[in-house]
Every structure is written in C-alpha cells, then in structure tokens.
Amino acid sequence: MFNKILVVCVGNVCRSPTAERLLKRFHPSLTVASAGLGALVGKGADPAAASVASAHDLSLENHCARQISARLCREYDLILTMEKRHIAALCDIAPEMRSKVMLFGHWDSEREIPDPYRKSRDAFEAVYTLLERSARQWAQALNAEQGKP
C-alpha cells in the first residue's frame, strides 16, 4: 500500500510542488512531499507556477525546494517523476529504489510532463492541466488499491 508519496522533478519549484499539492487535494489521507534532482534548494515555488496554481484555487505557499537523496527516497513508498530520464537519475542515486519509481503521468499513457521553467504562462497552464489530470488518475488508482470508490 502506498501511503507516503514523493514527487520529483528537476528544480522542485514548478512541476513537483504543484503535483504534490494536487495529490494532497485529491487524496487528503496521503503523506505527499516533493524534491528535485537539481533542486533550487531553499527557493519557493516559481512565481508563474504559483500564479497558475492560484488561478485554479491551489496554493503553493510555503513551498521550499529541497534536494533528492537516497536517504529521502527510502522514506517513501512510491516515488513519482515527471520524465523518464528522472527515473534513470533516481536509479543512479539509489538503485534499490527502482521498483517504487514511476512516472507521474503513468495512468495517462506513460506521458512525460514537460518542464515549463522560464517559459510562457501558456506553457505553465498546459503543464498544470497535465498535472491535474495525472493527480486525479493517481488518486483514483490509489483509492481503488485501498478498496475505496
């Protein structure tokens, strides 16, 4: 059973904090956190990501970027990444974690979710839509696993 989920992207300021908060919204009983492979440690959410999230009534307030580590990975039951190359990078950091690493877009035809960092607001909106859809799909799958409707 997956009760603790870690969401991973590169900087931990755009995609993973948004995905973290969306998973918490759709499945409040989960423990969800996020981290980055090349995190902008200590930074808050990207202003464009925060603005788009806010437009959808989702707050990224008080987010603080942190760096992924093998130790951090071991604390979670499931690790969700935005891109396939992130899976490979995590396996380099902690090879024993491979069996619990999947794409955030797994239920959406194994879709990779592109990085909107330093791109247009439209790019952030498109990524938000992908993240929201995938978060809903994960919440449904996790509810089914736990025998909930």
From Swiss-Prot:
Pathway the protein takes part in: Glycan metabolism; exopolysaccharide biosynthesis
InterPro entries: LMW_PTPase, Ptyr_pPase, Ptyr_pPase_sf, Tyr_phospatase_low_mol_wt
Recorded GO MF terms: protein tyrosine phosphatase activity
Keyword flag Ribonucleoprotein: no
Gene Ontology terms: biological process: polysaccharide biosynthetic process
Active site: C9 (nucleophile), R15, D115 (proton donor)
Catalysed reactions listed for this entry: O-phospho-L-tyrosyl-[protein] + H2O = L-tyrosyl-[protein] + phosphate
SMART domains documented for this protein: LMWPc (SM00226)
Keywords: Exopolysaccharide synthesis, Hydrolase, Protein phosphatase
Assigned EC number: 3.1.3.48
Biological role stated in the UniProt entry: Dephosphorylates Wzc. Required for the extracellular polysaccharide colanic acid synthesis. Probably involved in the export of colanic acid from the cell to medium. Involved in protection of cells against contact-dependent growth inhibition (CDI).
Family to which this protein belongs: Belongs to the low molecular weight phosphotyrosine protein phosphatase family.
Protein name stated in the entry: Low molecular weight protein-tyrosine-phosphatase Wzb
Organism encoding this protein: Salmonella typhi
Phylogenetic classification of the source organism: Bacteria, Pseudomonadati, Pseudomonadota, Gammaproteobacteria, Enterobacterales
